[in-house]
């Protein structure tokens, strides 16, 4: 099961969100191609938004949002519209998660990136541009906001914004289920199907 289960099974304790108001951030901007050789999900966080976070000498750019306190430990990213466009590389959500980001808030996403987020334990919330402005204005005060997945709402100060989410995707996040865990939930049916297949089509199982 995925490591984010505990966090999303309860109301998130809260995080000061990092606001990155750039539209059309593609997956190559999230994690450049030179870091895609690995098939491990760990170790990519240090290269998240590499070309925006570091100069040509590899030094951190001090005024980039994720290089400034308190955003160096941000769990929530508020992003511009069409976030995650471009190629379908799954390394993009891997890099976000390895950095520590478990929730992205935007007005729109590329479809493949959006679905890859759920598969990797990141909650991508879609709300309107006006609502984005509300939250970003609040976040500029360096105040924490909370994500309440059970009740599907973003809580900031005395305000809250409701968001929509597919029930099945919500279940997977709440229960920490990835593709393997979902398959294991149906292990009895899988075994039963294989036994039936062995009796009706035994040649499939011949060495």
Where are these regions (language model features)?
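Fe-S-dependent hydro-lyases/dehydratases of central metabolism
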Residues: 1-207
